[in-house]
């Protein structure tokens, strides 16, 4: 898909107190091993866990609380319009509150699939069009964790592959959002 804006950001949009409240709440919820989309909810073998952890090694909590969506959704709507995407959307998947311990990571991945979801419930038949990241902790409080985008609009015969990568430094301050 050709679009003129690959992402839209809001610097320090969410107040620090709300960020702290989300963190405090997320830390009280039961966590699970984070998975990538291809592994679903099925029981994994040791080999499957090892393969998955090559791409993603972190823990997460699923949050779908109205008070959190009320803070985040206005920015998604605003970005969708301001960036000129104008996607139709009527709901969000559960938020992933991800916990990274020392040396954990989430490597390169695409946030959408080429086919609609085939599962029970409200996501059935839908495709993720928009993804959002909210920086709950100030970027000065940890090392690593850079959010990079791969726009895939490069020709390896013309320029180096790394020249198409964009690091989203706009969202380092606490409370910043990128859609």
Identify the meaning behind each predicted range.
Residues 1-177:
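Fe(II)/2-oxoglutarate oxygenase catalytic core
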């Amino acid at each position: 898909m050709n679009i003129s804006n690959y992402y839209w950001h809001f610097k320090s949009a969410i107040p620090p107190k709300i960020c702290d409240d989300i963190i405090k709440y997320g830390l009280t919820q039961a966590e699970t091993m984070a998975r990538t989309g291809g592994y679903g909810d099925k029981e994994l073998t040791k080999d499957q866990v090892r393969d998955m952890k090559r791409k993603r090694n972190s823990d997460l909590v699923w949050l779908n609380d109205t008070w959190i969506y009320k803070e985040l959704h206005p920015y998604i709507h605003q970005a969708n319009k301001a960036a000129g995407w104008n996607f139709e959307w009527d709901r969000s998947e559960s938020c992933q509150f991800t916990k990274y311990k020392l040396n954990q990571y989430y490597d390169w991945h695409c946030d959408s699939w080429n086919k609609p979801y085939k599962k029970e419930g409200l996501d059935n038949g839908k495709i993720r069009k928009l993804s959002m990241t909210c920086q709950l902790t100030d970027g000065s409080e940890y090392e690593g964790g850079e959010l990079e985008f791969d726009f895939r609009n490069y020709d390896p015969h013309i320029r180096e592959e790394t020249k198409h990568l964009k690091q989203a430094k706009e969202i380092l301050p606490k409370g910043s959002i990128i859609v």
